[in-house]
């Protein structure tokens, strides 16, 4: 990485392995700073700090003189700068020489310190720095990494390190499942260390209540995706199918059910999750994208993926016009994940136009894209279509892949960490109580039936009757932070 500010020899000297920077000012606003631009959305940076006499020094994320966050020390106490000028002053038990680390995971920051680089003490975690930008503080700067020296004397820095912190499969050690429930129309999360036994966070209660985020006062069909930038992207259907009964509207559906069909609504939700704790939210109105979309009957089950050729996030979903057949469509989204940039295009439609295809789920396996979806060809079940490109040309396969005699929907494919095994999960809604079922494969030809939750090897510990789920990998550290966050809220 390149340093943006060259410090002249009169204020900085290299002595053996330490860079000594003369101090100035009394706050980060007027201190001496050596700045560098981070090249990644998810990264980790650290430096060894040597605090001189009368000096305060440390490691910051710096947008401008009014907007910064990080940790510094005078040798006696740490000073933690949080957004909007908030400060904390925990005691410094490490002395004047210490290591400072910043982990920035999509604008969710962890600050940690260490004496030896082996044992780290977390000072702050899940600190949201997403608001440190030009809309709030003017200018058009980047949120830069800064070495700070203020007060008197000088500060020494050595062993500055920076690395891309987007985890690979080898770094993963846990699984995260998202789902909703019919009785609450809210978002739930469950975590598993082995991919077999899942425990819901927040004691099995919603992590986000649907009536706090959805225009219809309920959400369905949550899906979560980790992008190539390391950020987590969540999408949900803005729909409450019992809204009239629960007193949220006067009619069964938002519009005439005979004309626009079951579950009609023109909206969905697109959310970027910052570090799995903090959220940036957007309600997407597909009916307002163009005059021709004013008569759409539904936008259901949105999922997010990434088109490597386009270099853009892609949302795909079930859509229909009025009460016509449901088909699968896609759109592209801007990099900030808050604006749809294209009009819906056909992704896949069932060869028999009288039947429908819904609930598409795309996964790249090798060089091909495998899309499992729900076919209503006689009954509701799971089929697969395969393509060499992500946004079309999916080949119809007449085979039914689920093992269920009853209706099922919401397929989701996920890989077992470190194994050449893939699990296809789906929602068996045709039974009472409904449940998830699972099959497993290594070649996508032969599938092993793993059964339903709590009827075979797949288990839940504190929840039942989940609806429309999705699973992704987490690192052990991410899983621990997520568990800790919800346990500490009790």
Feature roles, as predicted:
Residues 1-171, 471, 487-489:
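Extracellular glycan-recognition regions
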Residues 87-93, 122-146, 166-173, 179-180, ...:
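Surface loop/turn signatures of beta-propeller and other carbohydrate-active proteins
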Residues 111-114, 192, 270-276, 331-334, ...:
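Conserved Ser/Thr-centered positions that define the repeating blades of beta-propeller domains
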Residues 171-176, 230-234, 310-315, 368-370, ...:
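Entry beta-strands of beta-propeller and related beta-repeat scaffolds
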Residues 181, 238-240, 319-321, 375-377, ...:
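Residue-level signature of beta-propeller blades and closely related beta-rich strand-turn architectures
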Residues 184-190, 243-249, 259-269, 324-331, ...:
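Structural motif
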Residues 307, 333, 373, 377-379, ...:
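Active-site neighborhood of glycoside hydrolase catalytic domains
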Residues 377-384, 389-391, 401-437:
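Loop/turn-rich, solvent-exposed surfaces of beta-rich toroidal or solenoidal domains
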């Amino acid at each position: 990485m390149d340093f943006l500010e060259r410090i002249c020899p009169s204020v900085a000297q290299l002595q053996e392995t330490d860079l000594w920077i003369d101090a100035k000012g009394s706050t980060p606003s007027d201190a001496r700073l050596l700045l560098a631009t981070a090249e990644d959305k998810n990264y980790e940076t650290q430096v060894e700090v040597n605090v001189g006499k009368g000096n305060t020094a440390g490691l910051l994320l710096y947008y401008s003189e009014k907007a910064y966050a990080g940790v510094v020390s005078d040798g006696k106490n740490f000073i933690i700068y949080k957004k909007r000028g908030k400060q904390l002053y925990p005691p410094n038990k490490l002395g004047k020489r210490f290591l400072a680390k910043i982990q920035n995971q999509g604008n969710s920051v962890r600050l940690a310190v260490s004496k030896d680089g082996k044992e780290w003490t977390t000072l702050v975690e899940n600190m949201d720095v997403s608001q440190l930008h030009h809309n709030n503080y003017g200018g058009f700067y980047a949120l830069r990494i800064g070495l700070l020296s203020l007060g008197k004397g000088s500060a020494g820095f050595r062993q500055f390190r920076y690395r891309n912190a987007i985890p690979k499969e080898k770094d993963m050690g846990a699984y995260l499942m998202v789902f909703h429930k019919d009785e609450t129309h809210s978002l739930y999360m469950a975590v598993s260390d082995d991919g077999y036994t899942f425990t819901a966070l927040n004691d099995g209660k919603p992590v986000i209540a649907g009536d706090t985020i959805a225009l219809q006062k309920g959400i369905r069909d949550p899906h979560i995706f980790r992008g190539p930038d390391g950020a987590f992207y969540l999408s949900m259907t803005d729909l409450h199918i019992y809204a009239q009964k629960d007193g949220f509207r006067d009619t069964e559906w938002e519009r005439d059910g005979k004309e626009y069909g079951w579950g009609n609504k023109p909206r969905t939700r697109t959310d970027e999750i910052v570090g799995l704790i903090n959220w940036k939210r957007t309600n997407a109105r597909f009916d307002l994208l163009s005059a021709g979309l004013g008569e759409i009957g539904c936008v259901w089950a949105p999922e997010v993926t990434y088109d490597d050729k386009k270099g853009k996030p892609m949302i795909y979903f079930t859509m229909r016009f009025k009460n016509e057949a449901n088909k699968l469509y896609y759109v592209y989204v801007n990099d900030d994940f808050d604006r749809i940039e294209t009009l819906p295009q056909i992704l896949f439609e069932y060869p028999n136009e009288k039947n429908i295809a819904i609930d598409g789920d795309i996964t790249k396996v090798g060089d091909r894209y495998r899309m499992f979806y729900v076919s209503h060809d006689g009954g509701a079940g799971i089929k697969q279509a395969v393509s060499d490109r992500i946004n079309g040309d999916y080949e119809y396969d007449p085979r039914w892949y689920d093992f269920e005699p009853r209706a099922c929907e919401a397929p989701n494919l996920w890989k077992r960490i470190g194994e050449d095994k893939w699990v296809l999960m789906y929602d068996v809604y045709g039974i009472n109580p409904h449940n998830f079922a699972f099959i497993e494969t290594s070649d996508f030809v032969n599938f092993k039936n793993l059964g339903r939750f709590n009827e075979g090897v797949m288990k839940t510990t504190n929840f039942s009757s989940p609806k429309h789920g999705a699973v992704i990998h987490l690192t052990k550290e991410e899983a621990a932070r997520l568990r800790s966050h919800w346990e500490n809220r009790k």
